[in-house]
Regions:
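Polar/charged side chains located within well-ordered beta-strands of beta-rich proteins
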Residues: 43, 57-59, 211, 230
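Gly/Pro-enriched, hydrophobic low-complexity segments
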Residues: 148-238
Length: 238
């Protein structure tokens, strides 16, 4: 029994040592350190430049492939660096016919889906604007790694435990323009079983400012999709 316990203790010690060594190796990788520094610098500078613009955003909310609501917003960036939205208009699918009980059930379900849609959209927003401090933290903890096989002139970075334990974010970064090209995120709301996947494509304005062009957010448990498109970027009159 004593021999078995000693063997198990040795295995645990080896596992901890290997994990620590891998974390240290990742944190000491000069190439990784350089790429993370470039992404942090580019993200911070781009966020500052984007704050000078206003634009329009359209959200199309679908459940099980059926469009339920379309909403348009005017978007600007406030003094605190957070996006501020003013609703410009919306259209919703016509309510089904039926008695009061059925209409009550439908209205309750609609409110539930609306709240859920707001939650997944808010979660996506935290990923589509990469935080330099969270990127640095992921690097220091050994949760960032370079992936092979990307397109020429790009670097693919896989980041785990970025915002929540067990999440992952795959970032494609252009070495030529020093901009993020795309993000693929696997995350969740309050429970890891309440999965949310996010696919983001970026585009560049003529002035060289990078922005989210499209985002598709999938709330798996409710089979909800929120498709977002940003357009009509204008320098704000300040």
């Amino acid at each position: 029994m004593k021999t078995r316990l000693t063997f198990l203790a040795s295995l645990v010690a080896i596992s901890v040592g290997v994990a620590f060594a891998l974390s240290e190796a990742a944190a000491q990788n000069p190439q990784m350190e350089q790429k993370v520094a470039e992404i942090k610098q580019a993200s911070a500078a781009n966020k500052q430049a984007l704050a000078r613009y206003t634009w329009q955003e359209q959200q199309v909310i679908s459940v099980k492939g059926e469009v339920k609501k379309t909403v348009s917003y005017q978007v600007s960036v406030g003094p605190d660096g957070q996006q501020q939205k003013i609703e410009l208009g919306s259209s919703a699918a016509p309510p089904p016919s039926g008695g009061r009980i059925k209409q009550h059930i439908v209205a309750k379900k609609r409110d539930e889906f609306q709240e859920y849609g707001q939650q997944v959209a808010a979660l996506a927003k935290q990923y589509t604007q990469p935080d330099p401090q969270l990127l640095q933290q992921a690097y220091q903890q050994g949760n960032a790694s370079l992936q092979l096989g990307g397109a020429p002139g790009t670097v693919t970075l896989l980041i785990k435990n970025y915002l929540k334990p067990g999440d992952s974010m795959t970032m494609v970064f252009s070495e030529g323009t020093k901009t993020i090209q795309s993000l693929q995120i696997a995350s969740y709301l309050n429970d890891p079983n309440d999965a949310v996947t996010i696919a983001v494509q970026f585009a560049m304005l003529s002035a060289g400012v990078n922005h989210v062009a499209t985002a598709q957010i999938n709330g798996v448990s409710k089979q909800m999709t929120v498709a977002i498109q940003n357009f009509n970027y204008q320098l704000s009159q300040m």
